[in-house]
């Protein structure tokens, strides 16, 4: 696979860690939402985010997550409506008390200049209008906290500071730092 970063041509190589060499028995109580957004509708791309999400997807299947219980959202499918649908409707309808839930996000993150809240930037997100186009981290944690499940893991490969390659903050600006204060202990 080939891509560009900062105008330079890059070659992506698939490593042996990208392909699981194991297979565990299927567990019907394992659920995952895997989101990888590399090419945005109006933003710089987040290099390798979709490839990373696909690797996580393959590993989850090998770890016993049933394919019907693992949602992989990439590209246009990873818009705000898609993220909302799976976090706020699909998970609550499908998980049970003994379920394990994993949320993986690889893409852009950004803090709102107005509220200081951190947002996941969906495929159709606009960093200048995060309150209406982004997906707030606080909301994600609140929705996950409402699930009556045993275990929840959230893993993110996104920069919210403006200092890294997965942030949409203009270089040289000072972002506001937010703290999610949500009790998810049940």
Segment roles from a protein language model:
Residues 1-47, 62, 146-149, 166-171:
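Disordered regulatory segments flanking catalytic cores
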Residues 3-19, 53, 57-99, 131-132, ...:
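Functional beta-strand-loop-alpha-helix junction segments that form "active/interaction loops"
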Residues 21-22, 39-47, 71-77, 124-131:
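Second-shell loop/turn segments in exported
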Residues 29, 80-106, 110-169:
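Caspase-like (clan CD) cysteine peptidase catalytic core
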Residues 29-30, 66-69, 149-151, 185-186:
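Short glycine-/polar-rich loops that comprise or flank the Walker A/P-loop
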Residues 36, 60, 74, 149-186:
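Active-site-proximal C-terminal subdomain of hydrolase catalytic domains
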Residues 36, 56, 103:
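Terminal peptide-recognition signature
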Residues 46, 50-54:
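Short, surface-exposed alpha-helical segments at coil->helix boundaries
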